[in-house]
């Protein structure tokens, strides 16, 4: 192919497309040199600790974990004994209850590495050459620009997991957001109670109650598994987890699938110990001791996220994932998942700004465009919210706004308010009775926020302070969505200033939440008209042919969760395409087959490439003539290779969502056959008709809008009344109390008929006893709700104790976390006491 490229005519065409010149081989210009990261200066604990100290970042004094001991699974999880006998659970579990302790260590892999670039993260040079070849073979007007963009992406980006320097610099940036020019503020400081935030969330994130069959929040996690060996009745109500993901502390190097039994044992132990502590003579002290004993459940592994980073920022920016301990993830998900699974309410099906559960396919994008055009016609402002993304339509201009390092803006009180919302609006029966007990209320409201917000993380053998919430925890989306809600509410209260004005940016200081304007799309009405009028009349979704359009359609670049809108003449509606920058980056750098189980199968790598090229076509490549032509050719070529090997392609492609980074967006689509126009029709055909005015109102506060609720809170007409839980629970309590009072009145001594003072005194004592019972009942009947509401209103967050380590040399001791030295660390008094108590409990079972 090199000879073809270097012919005088082709060489001139290629250089013209790339806007470059050379007297040598054209491939020297076409193909960028492979990126090799510089030597990482912070790849040792000593260097990292000194770097953090120099930048005044808090290093924690190392805390130890008891050494692992083997227990019989059926003894640790007696309810699941049958699963052990049937081989569904392993015979023994390893739990941290030894008589000595160890310091944990975690050294993540960073690829590509300075010393070994390897094949990981290599750019798709074959696709680049195919693009060049088809550029010469066809006369696509946008072809030169596409080739130039892909080549530029290869030259400036790099897929990989960054570096230690990038991770540490990211920590500093997160601290800068949390404590810098605009320090974080709690909702109370901004001026919101938890009930007021709940009222706002009823508009911005409407939720339903969990299914009736879902167990209440009253049980230890292992009780959510009903197993008898009968497939017709066996069922697990535990939240879904990705079994191939990291198990976190204390099981470093293992997956969730490896440690399911251990996670259940630890989660059970933690929630039970928490329950005992919460009902002890000194609940706060007891809870603190429990958290300290299980400190590792609030320490996440600082995992470098694989992304397409810019090469120039390789040592400056690596996104960190706070890999939560499996038991912590399990407990948090038990609170959120049953509610959110039943709450796919968003702007396309409900009168809410929320985009939760939104899919651009099956008419989703067209619904968004219909709502936008309706707002433009009525000259109304429009707002949409998804996690740390805010979208505002105002004065014919579309604004895409992101919270700056969104997770860093979070405080424990933000998460506490979200827990309050889930319990009072989700985990509550129609009669007002709570579906949770005091133990779970204590965990959700007082303990969980401190476990994942402003907690700690582990990198190398350094235990570090985490500023804001750990990214990737089970509440990341929910907490971010709450913070975006606060920003939008303050925007409404301020009179909806234009996002490009100082008045809008002043909301940062008011809310303690940093944000940035990612996109300003002016003249949106005219852009939409242009997209319709210039829509292609040939090719995919135009004339029904299985070819790309000669000239791509005009995209309405909303940046809506990474998607733009294209008008289809065939379907007479808008359909989604991936944002061009993201599409080009995906084409330039494949992520590779990350599913290790699939990777071991013969032909898996070839199947991955088929999936990759078909996915690129599906998410928007079909609208780019040159990219579509090259990707289609590559896909067909790889299919033939599998056929020659005698491998059935459908065996892989049925599970294609495990291979593609876009699998979650295209769930249910089969790639057993190459993409055709009919494929695009099928994936974009609406499931039902749509009228924006016919969307139902939010379930909890119908006939109210976000503007009305915000205005009511601001004006003082909103009095922060008791929630429905309180009112209905009060009614039930009064009914029970009145019964006792009636009994007391029946015993009331009658002076006209009773002369026996001893008898009268005895009856009076009975009456007083019943009245005391009534009074105690009035208090105890509200205990469950009061622990969830009253405690929250006092902003009480209970956290374990952690001490800063001022000497980085001590924190980075290379002996820490290695061999016999670490295992000879004595247990703390709390660890010793709890180990003895658990051993006694097991003997008594």
Curated annotation (Swiss-Prot):
It is found in: Virion. Its EC number is 2.7.7.48. RNA-dependent RNA polymerase which is found both free and covalently attached to the genomic RNA. May also contain guanylyl and methyl transferase activities. The keyword Transmembrane does not apply. The lineage of its organism: Viruses, Riboviria, Orthornavirae, Birnaviridae, Aquabirnavirus. InterPro entries: Birnavirus_RdRp_C, Birnavirus_RdRp_palm, Birnavirus_RdRp_palm_sf, Birnavirus_RdRp_thumb, Birnavirus_RdRp_thumb_sf, DNA/RNA_pol_sf. Keywords: Covalent protein-RNA linkage, GTP-binding, Nucleotide-binding, Nucleotidyltransferase, Phosphoprotein, RNA-directed RNA polymerase, Transferase, Viral RNA replication, Virion. Interacts with VP3 in the cytoplasm. GTP binds at residues 248-255. GO terms for molecular function: GTP binding; RNA-directed RNA polymerase activity. This is RNA-directed RNA polymerase. GO terms for biological process: viral genome replication. It comes from Infectious pancreatic necrosis virus (strain Jasper) (IPNV). The gene is VP1.
């Amino acid at each position: 192919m090199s000879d073809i490229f270097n012919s005088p005519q082709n060489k001139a065409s290629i250089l013209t497309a790339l806007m470059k010149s050379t007297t040598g081989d054209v491939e020297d210009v076409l193909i960028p040199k492979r990126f090799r990261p510089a030597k990482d200066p912070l790849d040792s604990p000593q260097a990292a600790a000194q770097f953090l100290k120099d930048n005044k970042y808090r290093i924690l004094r190392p805390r130890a974990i008891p050494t692992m001991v083997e227990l019989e699974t059926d003894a640790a999880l007696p309810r699941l004994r049958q699963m052990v006998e049937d081989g569904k659970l392993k015979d023994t579990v390893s739990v941290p209850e030894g008589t000595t302790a160890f310091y944990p260590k975690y050294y993540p892999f960073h690829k590509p590495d300075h010393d070994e670039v390897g094949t990981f993260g290599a750019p798709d040079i074959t696709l680049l050459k195919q693009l060049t070849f088809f550029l010469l073979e066809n006369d696509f007007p946008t072809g030169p620009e596409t080739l130039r963009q892909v080549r530029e992406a290869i030259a400036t980006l790099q897929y990989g997991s960054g570096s230690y320097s990038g991770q540490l610099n990211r920590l500093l940036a997160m601290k800068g957001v949390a404590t810098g020019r605009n320090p974080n503020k709690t909702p109370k400081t901004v001026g919101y109670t938890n009930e007021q935030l709940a009222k706002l969330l009823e508009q911005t994130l409407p939720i339903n109650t969990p299914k009736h069959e879902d167990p209440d929040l009253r049980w230890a996690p292992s009780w959510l598994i009903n197993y008898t060996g009968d497939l017709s009745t066996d069922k697990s109500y535990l939240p879904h987890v990705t079994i191939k993901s990291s198990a976190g502390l204390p099981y470093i190097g293992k997956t969730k699938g490896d440690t399911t039994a251990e996670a259940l044992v630890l989660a059970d132990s933690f929630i039970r110990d928490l329950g005992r502590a919460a009902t002890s003579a000194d609940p706060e002290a007891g809870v603190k001791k429990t958290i300290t004993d299980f400190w590792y459940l609030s320490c996440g592994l600082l995992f470098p996220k694989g992304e397409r980073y810019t090469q120039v920022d390789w040592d400056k920016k690596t996104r960190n994932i706070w890999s939560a301990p499996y038991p912590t993830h399990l407990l948090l998900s038990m609170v959120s998942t049953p509610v959110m699974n039943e709450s796919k309410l968003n702007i396309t099906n409900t009168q809410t700004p929320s985009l939760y559960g939104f899919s651009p396919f099956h008419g989703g994008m067209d619904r968004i465009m219909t709502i936008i055009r309706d707002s433009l016609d009525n000259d109304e402002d429009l707002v949409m919210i998804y996690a740390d993304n805010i979208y505002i339509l105002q004065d014919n201009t579309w604004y895409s706004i992101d919270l700056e390092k969104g997770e860093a803006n979070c405080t424990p009180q933000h998460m506490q308010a979200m827990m309050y919302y889930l319990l009072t609006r989700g985990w509550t029966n129609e009669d007002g009775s709570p579906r949770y007990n005091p133990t779970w209320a204590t965990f959700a409201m007082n303990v969980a926020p401190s476990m994942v917000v402003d907690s700690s993380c582990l990198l190398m053998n350094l235990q570090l302070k985490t500023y804001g919430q750990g990214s990737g925890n089970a509440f990341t989306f929910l907490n971010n969505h709450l913070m975006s809600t606060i920003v939008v509410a303050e925007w409404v209260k301020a009179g909806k200033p234009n996002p490009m004005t100082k008045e809008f940016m002043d909301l940062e200081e008011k809310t303690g939440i940093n944000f940035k304007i990612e996109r300003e799309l002016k003249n949106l009405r005219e852009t939409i008209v242009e997209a319709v009028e210039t829509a292609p009349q040939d090719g995919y979704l135009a004339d029904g042919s299985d070819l790309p359009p000669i000239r791509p359609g005009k995209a309405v670049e909303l940046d809506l969760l990474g998607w733009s809108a294209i008008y289809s003449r065939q379907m007479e509606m808008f359909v989604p395409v991936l944002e061009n920058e993201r599409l080009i980056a995906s084409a330039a750098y494949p992520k590779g087959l990350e599913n290790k189980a699939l990777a071991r199968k013969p032909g898996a790598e070839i199947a991955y490439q088929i999936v990759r090229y078909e996915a690129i076509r599906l998410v928007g490549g079909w609208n780019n003539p040159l990219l579509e032509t090259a990707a289609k050719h590559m896909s067909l070529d790889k299919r033939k290779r599998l056929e020659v090997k005698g491998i059935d392609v459908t065996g892989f492609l049925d599970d294609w969502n495990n291979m593609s980074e876009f699998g979650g967006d295209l769930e249910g689509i089969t790639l057993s056959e190459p993409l055709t126009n009919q494929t695009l029709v099928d994936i974009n055909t609406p499931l039902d008709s749509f009228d924006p005015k016919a969307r139902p109102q939010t379930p909890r506060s119908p006939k109210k809008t976000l503007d009305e609720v915000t205005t009511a809170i601001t004006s003082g007409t909103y009095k922060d009344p008791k929630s429905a839980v309180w009112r209905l629970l009060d009614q039930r309590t009064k009914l029970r109390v009145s019964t006792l009072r009636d009994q007391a009145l029946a015993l009331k001594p009658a002076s006209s008929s009773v002369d026996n003072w001893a008898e009268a005194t005895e009856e009076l004592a009975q009456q007083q006893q019943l009245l005391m019972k009534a009074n105690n009942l009035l208090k105890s009947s509200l205990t469950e709700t009061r622990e969830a509401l009253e405690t929250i209103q006092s902003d009480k967050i209970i956290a374990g104790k952690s001490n800063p380590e001022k000497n980085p040399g001590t924190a980075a001791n290379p002996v820490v976390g290695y061999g016999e030295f670490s295992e000879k660390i004595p247990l703390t008094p709390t660890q010793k006491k709890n180990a003895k108590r658990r051993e006694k409990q097991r003997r008594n079972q």
